[in-house]
Amino acid sequence: MAKKGLFTYAGRTNQGDAKFGSGECAMVTASAGAQATFKKNKQLDWSIHFIPYHDDVKGAPQNSIIGGASLWVMGGKKPEEYKGVAKFLAFLSQPEIQMEWHTTTGYVPITQASYELTRKSGFYDKNPGADMPVKQLTNKAPTENSKGLRFGNFVQGREVIEEELEAVFAGKKDAKTALDDAVKRANDILRKFEAANK
């Protein structure tokens, strides 16, 4: 596809969003949060759909895994600080606050209550597809492979995958070789994490 000009790799972050927004490309795989940017572009006629899948694969489509930013609470602080953190997290988790955040940014609401509140408000009727990221995450009961990722050195592992994909996109490696190399390199990273945390 790349050789025929049907696929263009725009980079690891959100550079593809700009190409889509300008009309340079017809399709983009993007974060749920890209909806806010696309909505601001009044000249852009766009819609949002399920991630493509092979319908001949047993159980397809499965849930996509959650990504995006996280809030972390670190150890070693004073009890009063944790009380403040707890109040802040409780505030962020309120259905009304989550609905506002979700409808403004496009990011997925963090509770079922906030999703239901958004649905009942008519937001999804007025913004078709805005609930697609929620549907992709909750399509089925989670499997071992769709519960989300939690492992040490995640960022380094993701970088390996990105490097190997870039080698395929540039025509430097075939998909099988890149996948095998990604597995080997990522496993090496995991072994180092395991050794450092015994």
Where are the model-predicted features located?
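Extracytoplasmic/periplasmic substrate-recognition and gating elements
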Residues: 1-8, 39-108, 141-146, 173
